[in-house]
């Protein structure tokens, strides 16, 4: 049964989560009710659950949208004195605008130039217009014979045609030009002469040729057996009574058998084989020292 209390501090009961208890209700689960205040039943708090974080990429909850993450950077260091700017120390002409210089027109007074003397020009009587052929009329062709030109000395600096040494085109001499066909005449080959002694010519049996089965497909080989022996005469063949099948124990289980050896003398010594060195303190069995 539940217990009633008039404590002003609300307490959580052990009723199922999600049920709200009002004033005047007393459940049978051990609920503690405050006087005049409704409380929730006892249950686990928010800090009991360990849910994956939604911030960042490490151990991030893949079923949720990632929350915004920010990084705090340390304060940048102050710039050294040599990197500081000079500040507003530049002089800008106020008359210079983005359209050009804006100022009133100014004029300059120069000195008087030197006077030039009268030029020497021909007068009207120096011309003869009647001697000038009409410019607008067609005139017949006119030719002029000049004097004989002086003969130029012979230029001997240029080489003669036979002074050039061009590479021949016979054979593959110049790789950029097609070569002319060239032929080579070889001398007559001497006839083959037999050796002085015909016995010095090696015969077919003197060549050491490997077995053809080592580097080619093996040839079929056959073996001929010898003549079989004549069967044993009937009088030498053992009969059924010559065999003793009851004495054969190879294919049967048999009792263990032991052999008794001879008695050895106690004074007789046996040759012991070479044994590895034994550690210190090790004693042979049967000996006291």
From Swiss-Prot:
<feature type="region of interest" description="Disordered">
    <location>
        <begin position="181"/>
        <end position="211"/>
    </location>
</feature>
<feature type="compositionally biased region" description="Basic residues">
    <location>
        <begin position="280"/>
        <end position="289"/>
    </location>
</feature>
<dbReference type="GO" id="GO:0005881">
    <property type="term" value="C:cytoplasmic microtubule"/>
</dbReference>
<feature type="repeat" description="STPGR 1">
    <location>
        <begin position="122"/>
        <end position="148"/>
    </location>
</feature>
<protein>
    <recommendedName>
        <fullName>Protein CIMAP1D</fullName>
    </recommendedName>
</protein>
<feature type="repeat" description="STPGR 3">
    <location>
        <begin position="238"/>
        <end position="263"/>
    </location>
</feature>
<feature type="region of interest" description="Disordered">
    <location>
        <begin position="108"/>
        <end position="136"/>
    </location>
</feature>
<dbReference type="Pfam" id="PF07004">
    <property type="entry name" value="SHIPPO-rpt"/>
</dbReference>
<dbReference type="InterPro" id="IPR010736">
    <property type="entry name" value="SHIPPO-rpt"/>
</dbReference>
<keyword id="KW-0677">Repeat</keyword>
<dbReference type="InterPro" id="IPR051291">
    <property type="entry name" value="CIMAP"/>
</dbReference>
<comment type="similarity">
    <text>Belongs to the CIMAP family.</text>
</comment>
<dbReference type="GO" id="GO:0005856">
    <property type="term" value="C:cytoskeleton"/>
</dbReference>
<feature type="repeat" description="STPGR 2">
    <location>
        <begin position="202"/>
        <end position="227"/>
    </location>
</feature>
<feature type="region of interest" description="Disordered">
    <location>
        <begin position="265"/>
        <end position="289"/>
    </location>
</feature>
